[in-house]
Amino acid sequence: MAIKELLRQQNMNPKKIKLMATGISGSSASVKQITTMEMPTEELESAMTFEARKHIPMDGTDAVIDYQILGSNEKEVDKIDVGLVACTKGVLNSHIDLLKESGLKPGVIDVDPIAITNAFTFLKDMPSDGLAVLLDIGALSSSLIVWGSGQQYFTRDLPIGGHLSLIHI
């Protein structure tokens, strides 16, 4: 297994890893930003399940849905912006199984665009205004992530990766 071999080559003992954060590929998950009415936390969870089924193309019975409140909507009073994320139980369970088979204890599991964004926000040179853009170029696909200080957030998975560029060279 590639992960076990990588850990071995780096002389890393999986049992000594205190915090594990991983990402599920954007093509295996869906991310959507929506605007909804401000409501108590108890109501928000069931509302987000309904909203996810409405906005995210996925069979709701097999979906694992999570959300994060991004903040108050700047254009509409009494509304909030929410980031919705969904993937299938099968994708999530396969991801967890892969980590466990490698001797790793699953911790934070995010979707790649959000994991990259969270990592980037720890940088000191994060712009206070304007937009920040991240382009994660993978072998077969890429992720474009755009966000700004006013809770603007956009992500798109692109079916173009570095492998395609090498084929054309």
Please place each PLM-identified region on the residue numbering:
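Phosphate/pyrophosphate-binding loops at sites that engage ATP/ADP/AMP, CoA/4′-phosphopantetheine
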Residues: 5-18
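Solvent-exposed loop and beta-edge segments used for protein-protein assembly and interaction
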Residues: 14-16, 76, 136
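Gly/Thr-rich phosphate-binding beta-strand-loop-beta motif of the actin/hexokinase/Hsp70
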Residues: 18-23, 123-154, 158, 164
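Residue-level detector of flexible, active-site-proximal loop/helix-junction positions
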Residues: 113-115, 159-162
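Conserved small/polar residues in nucleotide/adenosyl-binding loops
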Residues: 167-169
